[in-house]
Amino acid sequence: MNIDDLSATIAELDSAAIQQAQQRQDQLTKPQGALGLLETLSIQLAGITQQCPPSVQKPIIVVAAADHGVAEYGVSAYPSSVTAQMVANFLAGGAAVSVLARHVGAELLIIDAGVQTAIVSEAANFRSEWLGAGTHNLAIEPAMSQAQAQSAFERGIRIAHELADAGHDLIALGEMGIGNTTAAACLTAIYCQQPAAAVTGHGTGVQAEHYQRKIEVVAQAVARVGSNVDGLQPLIEVGGFEIGILAGIIVGAAQRRVPILVDGFITTAAALVAQALAPKAIDYCIAAHCGAEPGHRIALQQLGLRPLLELDLRLGEGSGAALAIPLVQAACRILSEMATFASAHVDTAL
């Protein structure tokens, strides 16, 4: 894979479909713009899919899980063993994203990108893309090798193409990994040129001296790497295996004109990686929500994405993306099913 040529593999949004969707929105029985972000979203979806009206019938939530060496520094309120335990919980159907996926009628795919103890499961909705027993400690050394970073990214692209081939027309992103808000904070600090304190939150609930320690770790990692890095280098230095796979999924989905629902802080950090490698991929992204992590809003602003929801979520897993799936479907149905002024015999504005 030549990452220098990635943007050439992603088409611009379809201008004819966008124009058709805008014209139809303006003819529907409502004041122009009265449905706010739902109108904007429906037009974006038309441009992504080259269809007016667009349709989302087979959404899937993809949760990538991996461990992080930086967890040994006490940056999380939970031990690394929780990553594998939560993967088991996902597969058993007991996690928040499991419940929400059932609620919104979405399929759920769990990926082991690099859990400390490799997951063994025969579950139909599980796949192993194991890249190692977690990353190295990003505070003191590169989190992964160049080969691991490239493999993670390429695997993500391949997964997205397989999902598109299976008929999935919306890919929602989720993640699990103790220590991964620290990796996300480091990536956000580098890509957005922000100080550690501005992008580092409480994650799983670290408080007081542990929170200050987390800020120090992020600052230490960013200082080690420096700001003059591009391409895959930030992922190599301070990323995570799950973040690399998710970044690849974003690019692969964009190549196939499949819209992507970005979830919380970690998946948004993956979008920053994707943006650095293939800027046009972000045109295919929808921000499900803005969560409680301070770096999340900064990253969304860098990406130019406006969140659909603000619920103070800080769970990850794809929970916010799951909640946004019905909004995406609603945007499609409004454009498809609402009457026009002419068809409903309603007078237009004076």
From Swiss-Prot:
Keywords: Cobalamin biosynthesis, Glycosyltransferase, Transferase. One of its GO terms (molecular function) is nicotinate-nucleotide-dimethylbenzimidazole phosphoribosyltransferase activity. It catalyses: 5,6-dimethylbenzimidazole + nicotinate beta-D-ribonucleotide = alpha-ribazole 5'-phosphate + nicotinate + H(+). The keyword Glycosyltransferase applies. It comes from the Bacteria. SUPFAM superfamilies: Nicotinate mononucleotide:5,6-dimethylbenzimidazole phosphoribosyltransferase (CobT) (SSF52733). The active site is at E317. Disulfide bonds: none annotated. It is an enzyme of class 2 (transferase). Pathway: Nucleoside biosynthesis; alpha-ribazole biosynthesis; alpha-ribazole from 5,6-dimethylbenzimidazole: step 1/2. Its EC number is 2.4.2.21. The keyword Magnesium does not apply. Pfam families: DBI_PRT (PF02277). GO terms for biological process: cobalamin biosynthetic process. Catalyzes the synthesis of alpha-ribazole-5'-phosphate from nicotinate mononucleotide (NAMN) and 5,6-dimethylbenzimidazole (DMB). HAMAP family: CobT (MF_00230). NCBIfam families: cobT_DBIPRT, PRK00105.1. Belongs to the CobT family. This is Nicotinate-nucleotide--dimethylbenzimidazole phosphoribosyltransferase. It comes from Herpetosiphon aurantiacus (strain ATCC 23779 / DSM 785 / 114-95).
